[in-house]
Amino acid sequence: MSRSAFTALLLSCVLLALSMPARADDLPYRFGLGKADITGEAAEVGMMGYSSLEQKTAGIHMRQWARAFVIEEAASGRRLVYVNTDLGMIFQAVHLKVLARLKAKYPGVYDENNVMLAATHTHSGPGGFSHYAMYNLSVLGFQEKTFNAIVDGIVRSIERAQARLQPGRLFYGSGELRNANRNRSLLSHLKNPDIVGYEDGIDPQMSVLSFVDANGELAGAISWFPVHSTSMTNANHLISPDNKGYASYHWEHDVSRKSGFVAAFAQTNAGNLSPNLNLKPGSGPFDNEFDNTREIGLRQFAKAYEIAGQAQEEVLGELDSRFRFVDFTRLPIRPEFTDGQPRQLCTAAIGTSLAAGSTEDGPGPLGLEEGNNPFLSALGGLLTGVPPQELVQCQAEKTILADTGNKKPYPWTPTVLPIQMFRIGQLELLGAPAEFTVMAGVRIRRAVQAASEAAGIRHVVFNGYANAYASYVTTREEYAAQEYEGGSTLYGPWTQAAYQQLFVDMAVALRERLPVETSAIAPDLSCCQMNFQTGVVADDPYIGKSFGDVLQQPRESYRIGDKVTVAFVTGHPKNDLRTEKTFLEVVNIGKDGKQTPETVATDNDWDTQYRWERVGISASKATISWSIPPGTEPGHYYIRHYGNAKNFWTQKISEIGGSTRSFEVLGTTP
């Protein structure tokens, strides 16, 4: 038998073995997968990511979701929980509240040690869910409805995952994806002396953890790959989970189609990696932000699907974890992690290069113009005197724009941050609370791998944007260049070295089965939040119209590939977020228009868009579009709108709605 034939036979045997049902009692783990809606306010709330005062929500393209994975070791009953969210960041406020809720509902089961929360870093979701002022500047303060929707949804996703615990097996695989990201700060990257293998500026590694049930069926997967979720530009006003959210949607909705299947596309060291392959907003590979979102998402899906379908390495062994809060203010760093000299971190400050934004993904302006920002004015302004000389020296090459760590009565950026590590058999997963550049993450990954090999660790996955958010982390060499990422590295030139020290120490603790010390406590600032974004006083319909009336009816007929556009008199979307529901339905009533109505699309589907606009002082218009996708059954359809309106006199919020006349889908264009 030839070598190629033998290899093919061996691969076939492996795949057959993986797909064969196994006795539940023989399986090493139980796992549960769950998903819940975390979509915030869909109108008149600043979006989180681009820091633009002008970018406010005005509808929904697709909803935001939390995807939870609960893993339980069969032998010990020990559990780990990983949640990936379609959010710009996991802010510490969210982490603290979620953990408080879990501890209250499941005492002794879930705590900071075994729950990791992560974000995809979409820039097209409503903001205002941080307790630190720096991240609420362009949103005009704290947005309680959005915050509660996020917390409630994350908790609900974990509850659903726990309710679905089943025996199963885990498999790890990896591969390279080289056409879905590009380094937006290549000159800074090239200053690193250790870029062998990374000369083109990207980290191509994708890691996939597959969840296989007792029948040998794939129940879900987590894919880690570094690329910013900025395919949608700062000109977009529709809520969107961006490219990673589309990858999840495509696998779950278009490919698997199995109830309960959950696919998460998580981040790693994406700090300087853009999906805009032409290095300008909304460009690359196409010149349309929606096409780019789908294409970059499809490329991530295709690689993850390929890896999950290959013969993978089975994950076997114990579950373990470590977690600690660390005060980053003046944290000492040992010489082996620096330039051979003892160093320390600085009080947090942002640099002038941050104000320009990232021109490749979307420039600022951060909402820093005090005359245009009542929230900033109420905080006392951006600059409060000349920064102390000690801070200027500590921050080295950075020209300080604002010393955010010295703001009173509370700092504008975190001082205490979470560091976390999971052990899942021979895999270690690191949870880091910031955006790490390619080499900042690679250095930590390599160092942890070296520290963990003696414990049988074969794979290290680095997950940024986890448990909290403290802007960027660059290498020492990149920091000196003071591009956007360097100006956004809060704690000074040795920030990456500090994280590397903390993760190596934690890896050693896991290896030696030692506890880690938490000497700091993350402050709860929920008492002290402000909001200058106006709410809903009341809703009025158009003169001579009623809520739910159709302002624009569909044509009599369309063909597949056409776009149907209709409009309704509606209320303000802030009245009801319609969590786990929808603002629209596309309904199929059959070829004769008389069959039982069947919903074929909602506001979570790629082919629909729900756009809201204010008309006059208190009226609202909802414009709904449906791009008829290939595979749509010919027949009669109508579009229904759901909304809510607030009465001025009683302040009561009531559900409203309306439906268009029916229209016919004829098939493809001749």
From Swiss-Prot:
In which domain of life is the source organism classified?
A: Bacteria
Region (Required for correct folding and localization) location = 644-670
**Residue pairs linked by disulfide bridges in the UniProt entry:** C346-C394
Which positions bind Mg(2+)? Answer: H61, D603, D605, T608
Give the residues annotated as active site. Answer: S274 (nucleophile)
Mostly located where?
A: secreted
Q: How is its activity regulated?
A: Inhibited by EDTA, EGTA and D/L-sphinganine D-erythro-sphingosine. L-erythro-sphingosine is a less powerful inhibitor. Stimulated by glycerophospholipids: cardiolipin is the most effective, followed by phosphatidic acid, phosphatidylethanolamine and phosphatidylglycerol, whereas phosphatidylcholine, lysophosphatidic acid and diacylglycerol are less effective.
Which GO molecular function, any one, fits this protein according to its record? metal ion binding
On subunit structure and binding partners, the annotation says: Homodimer.
Q: What is this protein called?
A: Neutral ceramidase
Q: Which organism is it from?
A: Pseudomonas aeruginosa (strain ATCC 15692 / DSM 22644 / CIP 104116 / JCM 14847 / LMG 12228 / 1C / PRS 101 / PAO1)
